[in-house]
C-alpha cells in the first residue's frame, strides 16, 4: 500500500512557526511513521498512536496543541475519538483537531470543531493548516 501523502516538492522543508506538541493517531504504520518523521523535521514534538483507543489514553494523561487523527481505524475509530475529546476536561483538550481520511468527506464532521484534510495530501497543505511557513 502506498503512502497517503506526498512530501512537499521543495528541497527545503517548511518549518512550523513554533514548537507544537502533536498527537498523531493513524493505524497505517508507513503513513504514521512518514508523517511523524516529517512533522519532527518541521520542528514539532510528535507522539504517535495506532488507534483511537491508544490515542485517548495519551489525551487523558498528556496535553497536546494538535490532535491529527485518521477517521477509519480498528478498535476505536476517529469519530469515536472525537466524541471522547468533547468530554475531556478543558485542560486536556487539544487546541486544534485535524481529521484526515481518504474515505470520508468533510461533511461527515459537520457540527464539530474539526478541520478536515483529505488523503492523499501534500505536506505543505498540512503545514499550512498548522501555521507553518518556509524557512
Summary of predicted features, one role per range:
Residues 1-21, 115, 122-135:
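Non-catalytic signal-transmission and effector/linker regions of two-component phosphorelay proteins
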Residues 51-54, 77-83:
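Acidic catalytic/metal-coordinating carboxylates
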Residues 100-101:
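Hydrophobic/aromatic residues positioned on beta-strands within the core alpha/beta folds
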Amino acid at each position: 500500500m502506498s503512502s497517503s501523502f506526498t512530501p512537499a516538492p521543495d528541497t527545503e522543508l517548511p518549518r512550523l512557526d513554533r514548537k507544537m506538541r502533536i498527537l498523531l493517531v493513524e493505524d497505517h504504520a508507513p503513513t504514521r511513521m512518514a508523517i511523524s518523521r516529517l512533522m519532527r523535521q518541521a520542528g514539532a514534538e510528535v507522539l504517535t498512536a495506532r488507534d483511537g483507543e491508544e490515542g485517548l489514553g495519551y489525551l487523558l494523561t498528556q496535553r497536546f496543541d494538535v490532535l491529527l487523527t485518521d477517521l477509519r481505524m480498528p478498535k476505536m475509530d476517529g469519530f469515536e475519538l472525537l466524541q471522547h475529546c468533547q468530554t475531556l476536561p478543558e485542560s486536556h483538550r487539544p487546541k486544534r483537531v485535524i481529521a484526515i481520511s481518504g474515505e470520508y468527506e468533510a461533511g461527515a464532521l459537520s457540527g464539530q470543531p474539526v478541520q478536515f484534510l483529505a488523503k492523499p495530501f501534500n505536506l505543505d497543505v498540512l503545514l499550512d493548516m498548522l501555521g507553518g511557513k518556509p524557512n
